Amino acid sequence: FDVPCHKRGRGNPELTAFLGEKCVGVDVNSMKPLDNLCHPVSVIKEAEDLAAEAFHAAHAFLMVGGTTSSVQSMILTVCKRGDEIILPRNVHKSVINALVLCGAIPVYVNPAIDARLGISLGMQREEVAKAIAKHPKAVAVLVNNPTYYGICSDLRAIVNMAHAAGMRCLVDEAHGTHFYFGNGLPVSAMAAGADMASVSMHKSGGSLTQSSFLLIGPNIHAGYVRQIINLMQTTSGSYLLMSSLDISRRHLALHGPEIFHKVVDMAAYARQEIN
């Protein structure tokens, strides 16, 4: 006597035949034994605690609206109408949409361009320092790290500059899940001391598309972030997506270093052959 209408597959045989019994069997509604994503107190809370431990964060949130929802929650947490936020020109559209929603004012930093490859690079420390000096009342600095093309900024330096100016540092880490588990890779947002980071587990962590983590540091109030998330997040959180996040987190925690060591070796081989 509850949703979803497919009744764990019995109510929609065609869907069951396409996805399989196990898949539709996991697609259930929030109920007390399964916890609730909007206010987790048991199994979802445990999954979030394990994720926070794996990513060395003060707290982690399971996100089922893609990293778009993670990025927007970061910005809405720290920005109010009229606040300035320093960010690169090559931000994801979710950043711009968040500014529309909260009324914050962007202060753009133009990234350098690699003329030979025709791609934008990371935020340069000098340019960030200029923006901070020119806009001392800005509330935060947002960094793409890495960019879509894998370019990293000097994240530790930018975090330190932001904090020295009394600003938060937010990181769109959509393409940087592997930074937390590989050896010899660029520094992760949490290791660099960032206040919040959005991590696309489905991009390089192995979870299902649309699943993501929002990570926060010790100086961000987890309860307030939960309130912001619940302003926009569905009240029918997908247990398929949440399960995939938890399983993929465990997989990386146990096997991440060896997986990404192999990936680095493959990338080095491909680079050598291409060159």
Model regions: which residues?
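N-terminal glycine-rich, Lys/His-bearing helix-loop that initiates the first secondary-structure elements
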Residues: F1-V24
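Conserved PLP-enzyme active-site core in the AAT-like
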Residues: L15-F18, N36-H39, A54-A57, T67-N275
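Generic preference for hydrophobic/aromatic residues in regular secondary structure cores
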Residues: F1-K7, A60-F61, Q272-N275
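Conserved N-terminal alpha-helix of the aminotransferase class I/II PLP-enzyme fold
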Residues: E21-S69
